[in-house]
Amino acid sequence: NTVEIDGDKYNFYFEKSGGNKGAGLTGEKDDKYYQSGKLIKAGSDDKYQVVKVNTYAKNSDLDETLAEGEDITAYDKLDDVDAFLKDLDENGIAYYTKTDLEGMTDAAAKKILSDANINKKLADLKEVYIPKTELSTKEYFLVGTSGKVVDSKSRNKDGNDYYYVVEKAGKVGNIVAIYTEK
């Protein structure tokens, strides 16, 4: 269902049957993710956005609404590359930067770039960020303006000229690097 509010269109998905009939879906349906029924998609200016998956454990305030051992999942769009890097920092996820790569031998830097599916020379990159460990697709994924999850091997340029390098990892692509060219 599409709803227009103040000239902006929002897509929603509501459960069609069962005990949750009419409730907004939180989760995946047809390669798209929804939060409380609202489609999660990148803004038209952004082109692509990283979505962070947050899981919250059951607590005393939710005892009546959640079954034993059930968690709540929420999807948060990160505004831009800076917000994504800040989130990685806050969660202790280390990544290589251009400065790190420049401090290595040419062969070592070239291998890291190649492993991250970046076929550019380091000198041609303005910025580069490559997680040192594989990011879990259960924690981060990339969506386009249609809301479709980027799930194939690709390089996806956002509205700020950053490329998100994605590798196929099941239903959700794994973000393996971010870079921008000079």
Where are each of the predicted segments found?
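Extracellular adhesion/carbohydrate-binding repeat motifs centered on closely spaced tryptophans
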Residues: 1-182
